[in-house]
């Protein structure tokens, strides 16, 4: 039996820019690169770029670690200028030390900007993306992908209930 994809999750992933060649040496620079990807994709107004970065950076500094185990980092914040959720996905093949508890460098980044008016959607999205990224085979295929659409397909693929 397969889990039905959340329509919100599906639409968020379908519109997310995906960067396969992150090479920054600081996590703040990765966040800026992914915010710039949102701007370039038309998913974030250029005039909101600096404010989005300031909010993500504040969340990283004040709100604790967004680096998860297994090479995953999900920098995220509530961003009042938005009415919905905007996401950018990035792959850093060398990995970057983001302070994960397991000590592994982060290689898969999912930047999430959410409206404070949509707290349930924010939690649902984080839960849904985490369910997929917890699967070793999905992480492995993302790291091997040569095409953003291959990453998108992996993140949209229904996962089996356990």
Describe the residue ranges of each PLM region.
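Cytosolic covalent-transfer regions centered on His/Cys nucleophiles
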Residues: 1-162
